Amino acid sequence: EETDEAEIQEENTLETNTKITTDEYFTNSRLERNTMYSQQIENYQDILSNTNVSEAQKKVAQEEITRISNEQNAIMIAENLIKTKGIEDLMIFVNNESVNVIVKGNEPTKEEIAQIQNIITRELNADIEDIHIMNKS
């Protein structure tokens, strides 16, 4: 009987550690993504404030700042909309033409995948074939 209790305790510890690891993954990923966007914007703001930079380069820098800000807003909106569909947590990463969605927990159902694709295509103007959905449990 002691062995059973020890095994149960060990299983509970493993479940707790997995949950913490998954929670940390989403927290750290969100922090890294926000830091990356902030650094990109800061780099473009440096270009804008540099007196040795041409007006054409400044225009491109301003367009990039706007694009990054719009992308950040679209990601935030999409993540929040997807959470209203019952997904506990998720991360959206946009890389050139592809959108990677990492969903917390079990593999999403066909219905959840369709809802995620619908929201991503609408909010991020992505094509369905460019949306890649995975889970992290």
Give the residues covered by each predicted segment.
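Envelope-exposed proteins and targeting segments
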Residues: 40, 44, 78, 86-90, ...
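Mature extracytoplasmic domains of secretory-pathway proteins
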Residues: 56-80, 84-85
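Surface-exposed aromatic
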Residues: 58-66, 91-106
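Short, non-transmembrane amphipathic alpha-helical segments
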Residues: 78-81, 86, 111-128
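A short amphipathic beta-strand at an alpha->beta junction
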Residues: 125-137
